[in-house]
Amino acid sequence: MRWSDSENNKIDYIEDFATHFLNKNALLNVICKFCVFRSNSDLWVMRPYQICATERILEKIKEDNRNSKNSKNASKGGCIWHSTGSGKTLTSFKAVQLASEIDFVDKVLFVVDRKDLDNQTIEEYEKFQAGSVSETENTNDLKEKILDDSTATRAIVTTIHKLKRLIDQRSKLKDEDLKKKNIVLIFDECHRSQFGKMKQEIDEFF
């Protein structure tokens, strides 16, 4: 494996590698947060850019939470770019898992744009950790799991279509606390889902 720093500069010398990755904080983070035992007992260690991407997502969540208390116009969100075959699924899994452990986060929704990706994501996440996320059968199931306060449903995989149908039922949600929850939305394949009317209405609702 070729290692690099947070700016994607290659690290070729053992002294530089030791400085960046063998200090106690970095090494402890890799061991405790950025390793995954798959269901077949293989140990996967995240690549440097996957670790940086995941850490930046978590930093952005915390930053936006702080800013939201100071300004109604605080910018929210961001974009992580992964090329095909670069390990997007593992990055997204760790981002969802670690975001759901942040104390002020009530729910993390990993939103895909097709039903087959919904099933595929669940299958892949189950290989990383059984029971790590909840799947949604339909819009009502999604609503119930968002409103459920148990830790078993803190991380949810769903489709953008179910989420859109849910906010279309806002008249039925007026007596419930859906909008009061701190919900992190992570969109898969955002180049296909970030510019349409569905995404705009979801942003406006939350």
Swiss-Prot record:
Q: Name one GO biological process term.
A: DNA restriction-modification system
Give GO MF terms, alphabetically.
Answer: type I site-specific deoxyribonuclease activity
Transmembrane helix recorded as keyword: no
- What InterPro entries does the annotation carry? Helicase_ATP-bd, P-loop_NTPase, SWI2_SNF2, Type-I_R_enzyme_R_subunit
* Disrupted-gene phenotype: Non-essential, it can be deleted.
Q: Does the keyword GTP-binding apply?
A: no
A Pfam family of this chain: SWI2_SNF2
Q: Which domain of life is it from?
A: Bacteria
**Keywords tagged on the record:** Restriction system
Job of this protein: The C-terminal section of a putative type I restriction enzyme that if reconstituted might recognize 5'-GAN(7)TAY-3' and cleave a random distance away. Subunit R is required for both nuclease and ATPase activities, but not for modification.
The family database entries (PANTHER family) matched by this protein are listed as: TYPE I RESTRICTION ENZYME ENDONUCLEASE SUBUNIT (PTHR30195:SF16), TYPE I SITE-SPECIFIC DEOXYRIBONUCLEASE PROTEIN SUBUNIT M AND R (PTHR30195)
This one is known as Putative type I restriction enzyme MpnIIP endonuclease subunit C-terminal part
- Organism of origin: Mycoplasma pneumoniae (strain ATCC 29342 / M129 / Subtype 1)
